[in-house]
A protein has these predicted regions:
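A general, composition-driven signal for non-globular sequence regions
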Residues: 4-6, 24, 61
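Bacterial N-terminal signal peptides
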Residues: 15-26
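Small-residue-enriched, tightly packed secondary-structure blocks
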Residues: 34-239
Length: 239
């Protein structure tokens, strides 16, 4: 009799466990799908942003120096006052260049946030491109988060007429060079003090498995055809 009761109890426990797992899976699966859609949307918007920079003669320095950089961070939209307490931020992608082949890695996903962003053009949002100029820049991006200006140096890149005067590559000493525009105009966004952090959920969703930045940009252990156009755009622009 005791064995029968124990057997019934075990069945009930198993049933409850399966039910609980079913609920968890029901909530978890849409979350993964949503992250994957968000990640692909960011990649697509990053390509649009990149094209806007490399086609704009005022930002010729970006295009002309893509074959010198270690990597590139593209933030399709940094929103001023878009977060609690009026802080600003956005999410973007990092791609790293293979210096031997000129090919670009799959994208890794990052957020950027600060309470001090100021948009000189008066806009509420800006598109931002950050060129990772040194190995220290890449090493910083392999950590879970870091602060621009403290853990890695950053400078605003030359724009317009200043692009020619600032084109002397040996004079570049910053780890990151940033460029920003708002509604097609120069935004002059100062990113010093901003915190850049890994978006682990988006990385894993885009790669279809648990993936850290090192897995994506160092080990090349990630493959997604959704980034093909962005990679081709970068390689063509830098050739």
């Amino acid at each position: 009799m005791e064995n029968k009761k124990q057997s019934c109890l075990n069945v009930k426990i198993m049933t409850l466990a399966i039910f609980a797992l079913g609920i968890l899976f029901a909530y978890y699966t849409p979350a993964i799908a949503a992250d994957k859609d968000q990640a692909q949307g960011l990649v697509d918007r990053a390509r649009v942003t990149l094209n806007e920079f490399i086609r704009d003669p005022n930002y010729s320095w970006v295009r002309e120096n893509l074959n010198h950089v270690k990597g590139i961070l593209i933030f399709p939209q940094i929103i001023k006052g878009g977060f609690i307490f009026g802080a600003s931020g956005g999410t973007g992608v990092l791609l790293v260049r293979d210096e031997k082949t000129g090919n670009w890695s799959e994208p890794a996903f990052y957020s950027i946030g600060s309470v001090t962003f100021g948009l000189q053009a008066g806009g509420e949002a800006a598109e931002v491109v950050m060129l990772a100029w040194t190995q220290k820049a890449i090493d910083s991006l392999l950590s879970s988060s870091f602060k621009l200006g403290a853990d890695a140096s950053i400078a605003i890149g030359p724009v317009g007429a200043g692009a020619k005067a600032g084109a002397d590559i040996p004079s570049v000493t910053a780890d990151f060079i940033s460029f920003s525009k708002s509604k097609g105009l120069y935004a002059g966004l100062n990113l010093e003090g901003a915190v850049v952090a890994v978006r682990g959920g988006l990385n894993s969703a885009y790669c279809g498995k648990d993936a850290r930045p090192a897995d994506i940009i160092v080990k090349n252990d990630c493959s997604n055809r959704g980034s093909d156009e962005l990679q081709r755009t970068l390689k063509k622009a830098g050739s």
